[in-house]
Amino acid sequence: MDSDNSSNLIDQEIYSVYNEYEGIDIHYGLELSCIKGHIDVFKHCISRGALVSGYERMLYSDWINSPDYVDLLSLAAYNGHFDIVKHLIKSGFDPKYNDYSALNCACERNYLEIVKYLVNYEAVRYLMSAGLKFRLNVTNIPITKISELLAVEQDFIATNSSIDSVKNLLYTSTKNYFSNVIDASLVYAARGGSMDILMYLLELGASHNFAIICASIHGQLDVVKYLLQKGQEYTTKIEYCIIMAAQYGQVNVVKYLIESGNELDHNLDYCLKVTMYYGHTDTVKYLCNRYGERCYTSDCLIMAIEQGHSEIAKFLIVDGGIQLDNDNYIKTAVQRGHINVLKLLVSLGMDFTINKNLPIRIALRECHFQIVEYLIGKGVDIRSNNGYIIRWSLHGNSKNKVSRIIKYVTDNYADMLNVIKF
């Protein structure tokens, strides 16, 4: 089946939905056309009375290539349907709706044509609201004619406004409200790695300290490099970008920023711990290999154990040479129910019978029955000392956990019920 026939079938399927019903179904067809880009379907829905202004709803997970909560203009912008974007605005949809969501979607998805159109459109509207004159590079137009041009000539703004004209409009001696919107849009472009849009917005004069942080978080290394090379004076320290990149596991960004001369000074410990907390093994290894023994501490190992990151724990012990001389390591693993970490510690020689079999007592008390079975399999006798392990786990415990422990004992060690006082 060729693509044209396929598109026609899709159109016919959408038509069948809203031709049979009234009301919400034409809006459903309108929504589909914004997602799929079917301009004929869109126009037909409008002619049938579908409303575009203020229409939004939650989209569920079965919708592909759409944000979670959107309006129609954002849907069209997110999916790159320029014709739909223009028709929505012509039909009365306000680009400012939902805090310029459509502009931000287009920035993040790298649809430069849509971004330029929305920016230029808002530049004109700003001048209209200010009662000023709009001067294009190609001609001078009285302000009274602008609204007519917007309604009649769809492509006029997009095709005739140059960067210089828009820049002069937006960035006067006192920055206006829309210049702040452009600054915010730069963040979305940085997050999406949209280099063309990033350069366009920067050429307009956009500036936002959060853009480089956002690019670092999302691993947009090219954006990070470009912003640094632009030489902007960021009020936020690059060290914070390193920490955020490390927190999200963007090891390439971390490596680039550090090796560009931005060493972690006073925040190494925090950066390392937050990276371990989220379990980014490659980033942890890079930081440890670069900063050496400063990273191989008991606190770092406890952090890895608490979060159940057995691979990081193994790296710190085996490669970092951390000694297993702290009973808190095995107690923490059992307390948190991390059986893989417990197995690692036992395999490396830690004693699982410390303090009168405290690990299995903790495991039973916390209802980590998989760990209980593992330790029994390693030789711990749950019946020893007249059921002391079971009695200890029941004493002072919550009603919910007591009932679960009793059920476990009943199902697996019914002979112990006679010697346990509940």
From Swiss-Prot:
Coiled coil: none
InterPro entries: Ankyrin_rpt, Ankyrin_rpt-contain_sf
ANK repeat residues: 25-54, 68-97, 99-127, 181-206, 207-236, 237-266, 268-295, 296-324, 325-354, 355-384
UniProt keyword terms in alphabetical order: ANK repeat, Repeat
SUPFAM superfamilies in the cross-refs: Ankyrin repeat
Gene3D superfamilies: Ankyrin repeat-containing domain
SS bond list: none
Protein name: Putative ankyrin repeat protein R789
